């Protein structure tokens, strides 16, 4: 983990002296300068730890023995954690700036009243490609199966993302529980093997920027960072459908510094901070006041702030339950 900031005294919800906040977040998913700023403004030191999958984060919190005050799970994982009583119900009277969150990002199926979560970032899963290394611009998932891309495709390390684009290519739902559909998607995915160069995490950014692969299946924010570093890269969301995801701030029941957790949520809801974070990370912000502060070159880019028409073809992951999640992972 990493420590940012300086020490100071703060009163915790129990009245004991506290100067600490423990955050559990995805890697490379906040501007470090904001953590420094938070500490300078509040005197609260941040202990920052990272995870690389929702499943890893969920398992660690579920097993107990941790003291995370803030975590950043995705949509379907929030639903699961709420049902398993792993999250604190938020006191809205302690939250300032929630009204700045766009209506499209509130009241979603995984937390219908936002009783447990505050929108942080949102985005899509799509195809990043190198214009100098592809003969034809990929527009559809089926394009990945072209023999032109033998040993030229990087896949994000996520079972639902990888199986998901195979399901989408066949016209099936990302949340299907139909075993026939899943087996057909598995068979089709297996036929992609000759084209797969590697299944990777954050390392994909370096490989794509360096031109080590022609195509990558990844998240929109990761693609944004790649595009900033290599002018030959482009990003597309296939028109037949893909994943629309949401990552939210939550307070796990492992919380030891609840007052500090609310202070952090309010800090991140400030438009100037949310805008700075969005520009640094490259993901789309649900904070409309923050979006207004961003350059139009960012907010007008339909690859990263897609149109309503595109969004209608996208699906949010449902919480499949342990049995079906296991089946997806096994495939």
Predicted regions and their residues:
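Short, hydrophobic alpha-helical packing/hinge segments within bilobed ligand-binding/sensory domains
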Residues: 57-58, 78, 141, 204-207, ...
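Mature extracytoplasmic/periplasmic domains
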Residues: 243, 252-311
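A ligand-binding cleft/hinge motif common to bilobed small-molecule-binding domains
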Residues: 77-80, 209-210, 215-232
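General small-molecule cofactor/ligand-binding pocket signal
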Residues: 24, 47-49, 197-199, 234-236
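Extracytoplasmic ligand-binding site segments that recognize negatively charged/polar headgroups
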Residues: 67, 72-212
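Conserved C-terminal helix/tail region of periplasmic/extracytoplasmic solute-binding proteins
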Residues: 308-331
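Early extracytoplasmic/lumenal segment of secretory-pathway proteins
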Residues: 3-81
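Periplasmic-binding protein-like
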Residues: 123, 182-191, 229-253
